[in-house]
Amino acid sequence: MLVLLMVLVFTLVLLFAFYLINFLLSIKDMGKNKISAFECGFVSVGKIQNSFSIHFFIMMLMFVIFDLEIVMFLGILVSDLSSYISFLMMFIFILGGFYMEWWYGKLVWVI
C-alpha cells in the first residue's frame, strides 16, 4: 500500500513539474497575428463565421456510436455461451436505433 501511495505521489509531482516547466518555457506572444485566423496569408477582413454542417456532425456521431457498439460485440462474442442473451438484446437495441435513424431520415448522404 505504501508503494502505491509513493507511486501516486511521484506521478502527481512529476505531472505538476512538467506542467510548470511547460508553462514557464512557452511563448506567450498574444499579438494580433498570433490570435487571428489564418486565411491564405492575408489579414482577415471582418468577422469570420465558421459554418458547421449539423448533418455531418450527426453522421460522425452515429459512426462513433456504432463503432463503439461493434467493439462491445467483440467482447461479448469471445466470452462464454451464457452471454448470447445479452448479445441478442444489444443487437436488437442497435437495430432499433438504426431503424429509428433511418425512419427520421438521418441516413441520407445527400445534403
Curated annotation (Swiss-Prot):
InterPro entries for the chain: NADH_UbQ/plastoQ_OxRdtase_su3, NDAH_ubi_oxred_su3_sf
GO terms of molecular function: NADH dehydrogenase (ubiquinone) activity
One GO CC term on file: respiratory chain complex I
Gene3D superfamilies: NADH:ubiquinone/plastoquinone oxidoreductase, chain 3 (1.20.58.1610)
Keywords: Electron transport, Membrane, Mitochondrion, NAD, Respiratory chain, Translocase, Transmembrane, Transmembrane helix, Transport, Ubiquinone
Membrane-spanning ranges: 1-21, 56-76, 85-105
Enzyme Commission numbers on file: 7.1.1.2
Catalytic activity field: a ubiquinone + NADH + 5 H(+)(in) = a ubiquinol + NAD(+) + 4 H(+)(out)
Subcellular localization, as worded in the UniProt entry: Mitochondrion membrane
GO biological process, one term: mitochondrial electron transport, NADH to ubiquinone
Class of enzymatic activity (EC top level): translocase
Membrane topology: Multi-pass membrane protein
Pfam family, any one: Oxidored_q4
Keyword Membrane appears in the UniProt entry: yes
Primary role: Core subunit of the mitochondrial membrane respiratory chain NADH dehydrogenase (Complex I) that is believed to belong to the minimal assembly required for catalysis. Complex I functions in the transfer of electrons from NADH to the respiratory chain. The immediate electron acceptor for the enzyme is believed to be ubiquinone.
Family: Belongs to the complex I subunit 3 family.
Name of the protein in question: NADH-ubiquinone oxidoreductase chain 3
Lineage: Eukaryota, Metazoa, Ecdysozoa, Nematoda, Chromadorea
